[in-house]
Amino acid sequence: MSESGAQQVLARTEARRCLTDIEPRLFPGNGGPDHGEVVEVCGPERTGKTELLYHLLCRCVLPKSAGGLEVDVMFVDTDYSLDMFRLVSIIDSRLTRALSPSAGSDEEVLRSCLSRLLVVHCSSSSQLLLTLHFLENSFSSRPGLALLLIDSISAFYWLDRCEGGASFSKQEEKLSKCSELLGRLLRDYRITVFATCHAIRRIHSGLSSSSFSSSDSDRPYLCRSWQHLVTHRLLCSRQASTAGGSKEQRMRQIFTVHCSSSTGTKAHRISSFHVTDGGVDFT
């Protein structure tokens, strides 16, 4: 690469927006993810993880006039579960609430929001590795591309274990390579990553240096290369329904998110939300 080309890439990288304010209600004060940091969104099924990703995605692609950050997002769908109808419904609902009729047609603004979203699908760890290689071109050429969402990073865990046979290193080899490449992308392009991780109960003989989960049963189980990348963890759970209150209160499911960090701070935060037709609503 020529000197002028390298300077242009550097300038685009430095212009990438920091996402420490992506959702103040999730993270402790001034404790959101900085450039080059990874947030793992973990928890059992049906605890609001994907809805939380939709919320963060919408927050990024919405215009500033609607309370958004107006940055581009890359969504890597490994579960083939991305619901575009749901996502469009959430964006449209937020635009309707936030914008005045003079701000332009709903369809025009909605199209502008969706133009900031790029979606790719993967069906194996090998495809994920190739996808990350491919994405480097996008990160280098689009300074507005600030957020990478992966739903989920643990999608191929059992498949990789089966293909790896009795060798533990072989079982983790593919995800380790993905994590190492992702680490380089984080350093070189200063993006922010959010990735969901399914809860898998597994007994550990000891804690790694990067383990900062809130209980023994929620310790990380993915490879060390991935664990070393994670700087924040959002542990999602579902509150038990209460017998008291109105019928609406009893029917409305409340989800809880416990935020912890490995960046040297002791700050934690617990937030609650419920899911509406218009997306996540914090309580």
Predicted stretch roles:
Residues 172-176, 180, 184-283:
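Phosphate-binding/switch region of NTP-binding enzymes
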